[in-house]
Amino acid sequence: VLIVDIWVPTLSGIYVENASGDIAFSDTLTVSDFRLDSYSSTGNYQLKLKEGIATLAIHNGPADLKAEGNVGTLYLYGVGYGKIDCLQLKTENAYINNKGTNGFYVHPISVLEATINGSGNVYYTGSPATIKKTETASGKLIHL
């Protein structure tokens, strides 16, 4: 087991490719724009985010992602097999593209736009004023 602790004053993104391992934030990251991209990787990603824009993408592979905190705008993208759980990440605007086989979970306040091109569902809590959905596969948009 290898554990690496990284301490930085700010962090704008994380890129993971062909890797196996977990990522966990011990404290909340406050940043105007953050991006996570995971390609062909396994592991559990646990993020704590505040403010700004968050783009979280599991391009392929079985990595699972869980995020908490508050952000202004959330972009979620997934083609893999992993679960993306952002129920504890409140966001004003959520833009979702689920092409994968597992569920995405979000908590939008104002806007929810979900494109579902796979068998994975998009689950949401709250009562966003604007909801737009495009379902071209067996996955559905489901209110919890």
Where are these regions (language model features)?
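Second-shell loop/turn segments in exported
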Residues: 1
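Extended, compositionally simple hydrophobic/Ser/Thr-rich segments
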Residues: 4, 11-144
